[in-house]
């Protein structure tokens, strides 16, 4: 299992816990509002909005909240904020690269909170471009295994542009080019295979191995960054070995 997959497994488990928090709901709602504003309020004609709504539903966000966010974004209801996407770059403990994706209506607040979280947790900010080149934008679909085998999933999505299908233990992860994301999730739907989420993600091209102590420090930094309401996603290039994962699970 690659470092990507181990990190994804850890992130997935963490996401299940985070989903119980109102903060996670708020971030999903924000995604819906921005998607509707950018590409229109009809999910049938706006794949990004469709995927944002599906993920929110899978995470048990109430339908009323989802619909209100869609309407605010589409201009059908007042109250939408002027959200801006901002990327910050930096390095965490052990030289781990950190890419921070913010969605904010206050650039100064976002910058301040990100900088504070970084400096208080062994990280430091980096110049634009000095970290982002280590990451590549990818389309990522995750699904519960259920009765499906890896071959079942692979056969369903291979012709749709899927690059790889990875077994993450309790789930499968499908990686593609971002432009093939809609085709991949549509192929799953046509095959009658349910999925949890379909979204663009950043994947590291070069990874940094860390021991258990280093991993805990990186997780602490990521947690601190994600405490900010302005931070939507945090990506790192940390590589976790089987031994480190086992030690972390103890």
From Swiss-Prot:
GO annotation, cellular component aspect: cytosol
Membrane-traversing stretches: none
Subcellular location: Cytoplasm
Keyword Cytoplasm belongs to the record: yes
Alphabetical UniProt keywords: Cytoplasm, DNA-binding, Transcription, Transcription regulation
Molecular function per GO: DNA binding
An individual GO BP term: regulation of DNA-templated transcription
NCBIfam families xref list: PRK00110.1 (NF001030), PRK12378.1 (NF009044), YebC/PmpR family DNA-binding transcriptional regulator (TIGR01033)
Record protein name field: Probable transcriptional regulatory protein ROP_68700
Classification of source organism: Bacteria, Bacillati, Actinomycetota, Actinomycetes, Mycobacteriales
